[in-house]
Swiss-Prot record:
Keyword entries, A-Z: ATP-binding, Chaperone, Coiled coil, Cytoplasm, Nucleotide-binding, Proteasome
Gene Ontology molecular functions: ATP binding; ATP hydrolysis activity
Compartments in which it is found: Cytoplasm
Entry superkingdom: Archaea
Listed InterPro entries: 26S_Proteasome_ATPase (IPR050221), AAA+_ATPase (IPR003593), AAA_lid_3 (IPR041569), ATPase_AAA_core (IPR003959), ATPase_AAA_CS (IPR003960), NA-bd_OB-fold (IPR012340), Nucleotidase_PAN (IPR023501), P-loop_NTPase (IPR027417)
Protein encoded by which gene: pan
SMART domains xrefs: AAA
HAMAP family with a match to the protein in the record: PAN (MF_00553)
Protein name: Proteasome-activating nucleotidase
Region (Disordered): 1-22
Organism this protein belongs to: Aeropyrum pernix (strain ATCC 700893 / DSM 11879 / JCM 9820 / NBRC 100138 / K1)
PANTHER family documented for this protein: 26S PROTEASOME REGULATORY SUBUNIT
Length: 409
């Protein structure tokens, strides 16, 4: 073997060794990178479980409501355990968020505010009907020209043109009370007001505010008015207000006293806001004679509007509204139908049009005829007979309508 060939062999082995070591180094580096990533992931997971253990072992906080802010470091709160407390404010809590009514968390000893909790509403309040922008306007309400004028002046005008009242130096009504028989359009009027003012429509039924627990009804009233202010401009419509605003009696059960507390909270809320605010209260009842006089005094529900059963002209307008989109045969005489329906409410007239549509469907037709309308009037009137019972006024109106139907037939 020559010297040159021996040197070449050693050089080849030396280069081959370098190549193998380079591969091993690359593999080891890849393993290091992989293990480093795994270590970071495991560290994050460890921190997560440490935090979870800390949460599980940490004592619970006490919920409280701020009553008064004394200074940046001391606040009066009402704790969920009962008593009012003067507590300190932890360093990390923003003092600007501590306002009367704010919900806060106290430490387990109840001596320090450690956090300000987000505001919330009772589930009953959130479940109430809230319609952001109702698609109902005054043109959709028939036979109530005088009532529309009164409610426009009392509610719509102060919201749209408050400067008129400021210039005159007068206050518009804070609340409007609608009263009249069922189905005459009280809720429809309230929705039309919300539609005309582009306001949020909040509908509350009085019976929902009657609660068996002491203080619950009053708390619900406070939360409803708070929701109305946050959604302003808003129309707060309280239906069946007689459930919480009936006349007070000296002798009553604990349930009666709770209803009275709810009514007093309602009066306090009405007394507490500016008449020119963008929150207007409209209430409705079928029994004005049951309402407590304190509710009706000036400064509260001081505009009382009767919504009666529609007149002949009103019934004709209502029928025109409900048949606006219906396919009617040329022989349908709405004026004759209006004469047949004396004593009918707006809801009854809508039921007549719907029932006439069903009559047409049963015949296999797609057009409503006069005969369909007359049969529908008879069916709705029969239902009114059962519903009217022994009321002599309703019976007299129905008898008059029966005589008219007999004449037409």
């Amino acid at each position: 073997m020559t010297l040159s060939s021996a040197g070449g062999s050693r050089s080849h082995r030396h280069n081959g060794g370098h190549s193998e070591r380079d591969v091993e180094i690359r593999i080891l580096k890849d393993k290091v990178r992989s293990l480093t990533k795994e270590k970071i992931s495991l560290q994050k997971e460890l921190e997560y479980y440490k935090n979870e253990i800390t949460k599980l072992l940490s004592p619970p906080y006490i919920e409280a409501v701020v009553l008064e802010v004394i200074d940046d470091n001391r606040v009066v709160v009402k704790s969920s355990t009962g008593p009012n407390l003067i507590v300190n404010v932890a360093a990390g809590v923003d003092a600007r968020s501590l306002k009367p009514g704010a919900i806060v968390a106290l430490n387990n000893r109840g001596s320090t505010i450690v956090d300000v909790l987000p505001g919330r509403y009772d589930p009953l309040v959130k479940a109430m009907e809230v319609e952001e922008r109702p698609k109902v306007f005054f043109k959709d309400v028939g036979g109530l020209e005088e009532q529309i004028r009164e409610i426009y002046e009392a509610v719509v005008l102060p919201i749209k043109n408050p400067h008129l009242f400021r210039e005159l130096g007068i206050d518009p009504p804070k609340g409007v009370l609608l009263h009249g028989p069922p189905g005459t359009g009280k809720t429809l009027l309230a929705k039309a007001v919300a539609g005309e003012t582009e306001a949020t429509f909040i509908r509350v039924v009085g019976s929902e505010l009657v609660n068996k627990f002491i203080g619950e009804g009053a708390r619900l009233v406070r939360e409803i008015f708070r929701l109305a202010r946050e959604k302003a401009p808003s129309i707060l419509f309280i239906d069946e207000i007689d459930a919480i605003a009936s006349k007070r009696v000296d002798i009553g059960t604990s349930g009666d006293r709770e209803v009275q507390r709810t009514m007093l909270q309602l009066l306090a809320e009405l007394d507490g806001f500016d008449p020119l605010d963008n929150v207007k209260v409209i209430a409705a009842t079928n029994r004005l004679d049951l309402i407590d006089p304190a509710v009706l005094r000036p400064g509260r529900f001081d505009r009382i509007i009767e919504v009666p059963l529609p007149s002949l002209r009103g019934r004709l307008e209502i029928l025109g509204i409900h048949t606006r989109k219906a396919k009617m045969a040329p022989d349908v005489d709405l004026e004759a139908i209006a004469k047949l329906t004396e004593g009918f409410s707006g809801a009854d007239l809508k039921a007549v049009v719907v029932e006439a549509g069903y009559n047409a469907i049963r015949r296999g037709s797609r057009v409503i005829t006069m005969d369909d309308m007359i049969k529908a009037v008879e069916k709705v009137k029969a239902a009114l007979d059962k519903r009217g019972g022994g009321d002599p006024f309703i019976r007299a109106q129905q008898k008059s309508g029966d005589d008219t139907i007999a004449t037409v037939i």
